Amino acid sequence: MNLHEYQAKDLLESYGLKVQKGIVAHNPNEAAQAFDQLGGKFAVVKAQVHAGGRGKAGGVKVVKSSQEAREVAESLIGKNLVTFQTDAEGQPVNSVGIFEDVYPVTRELYLGAVVDRSSRKVTFMASTEGGVDIEEVAHNSPEKILKVEVDPLVGLQPFQAREVAFKLGLEGKQINDFVKTMLGAYKAFIECDFALFEINPLAVRENGEIVCVDGKINLDSNALYRHPKLLALRDKSQENAKELKASEHELNYVALEGNIGCMVNGAGLAMATMDIIQLYGGKPANFLDVGGGATKERVIEAFKLILDDENVKAVLINIFGGIVRCDMIAEAIIEAVKEVNVTVPVVVRLEGNNAEKGAKILADSGLKLIPADGLADAADKVVKSLG
């Protein structure tokens, strides 16, 4: 689950980090009032969306008066912002953040952390190249990114943070401020179950103060049951409507741009299914994993979800029966086909637990379902069914 910038800054501030002061506004009048309340000569108006690249897309503007703040807010709120990280429709802007002017600054740094699956540790990354896309830095100048793996048994140690500060070229009070920032960020990461966080840029002001000018936090969705207050911050308007609906039924769904709908149990099998569809000349319309313990109700909802996509011209159902029985899947498919009034070809491949029984149920149903013997045969048939 992603947080908005203003939410991320509020959370980081509660852990002792110095953040750029700001006020969220949901309409132009609130934006004008926020400018006056901050009391500076300048302010920065930022569209609050779950996407990067806001500046290049016109979602970040410097304003010099409350009237300018009002006008910029009016141009953003209620519109969709399209960035390189969104689809063609963009993300809806329901609010803007009015943030204090912290410039001029002497340096812009980068600080972030992720759960590194290869090392199975929280890994911090820092760089002197703040204020730019960190992916570009990693690609063009990987030597400029410092990495620190954190031993989960002892946590991030002050000496590790000091070492990073030295390598970033900080000095004097800046070192202590950076250590406090990094240790506070780690504490927030662990206690709030972050999956990722970024401060870009982490600015060093002329007076030596270190300030978080931006903040990005992604929370581990599997841990949200432990954080009801954080869950309350969820902005569903920023999420794909189909993916949101899928999550409500415990389905793992990702929309793609093809025309062959896929329903599979197991993420690995789902990826293999998409690969073989591509191999046979087709294009998958989605990734959809109904899970190893799929129920009849979940399969029916998955079928509806696939067919809600008007681009879907054929469907491939690929089920390996382990925990889930193929005969139960077959009954759910029949029920779903009847309920949804399917008008596109449906290819079904069943293997494993009660596969023969499931195949017989489908054959006796009288429905125009296309049976497949093996994964290659299924991919070949679903691609050919498109004509």
Swiss-Prot record:
Transmembrane intervals: none
GO biological process: succinyl-CoA metabolic process; tricarboxylic acid cycle
UniProt-listed Enzyme Commission number(s): 6.2.1.5
SUPFAM superfamilies assigned: Glutathione synthetase ATP-binding domain-like, Succinyl-CoA synthetase domains
Reaction catalysis annotation: succinate + ATP + CoA = succinyl-CoA + ADP + phosphate; GTP + succinate + CoA = succinyl-CoA + GDP + phosphate
Keyword presence, Zinc: no
One Pfam entry name: ATP-grasp_2
Residues in the signal sequence: none
Residue numbers binding ATP: 46, 53-55, 100, 103, 108
Binding site for substrate: 265, 322-324
PANTHER family recorded: SUCCINATE--COA LIGASE [GDP-FORMING] SUBUNIT BETA, MITOCHONDRIAL (PTHR11815:SF10), SUCCINYL-COA SYNTHETASE BETA CHAIN (PTHR11815)
The protein's assembly and partners: Heterotetramer of two alpha and two beta subunits.
Protein name: Succinate--CoA ligase [ADP-forming] subunit beta
Protein encoded by which gene: sucC
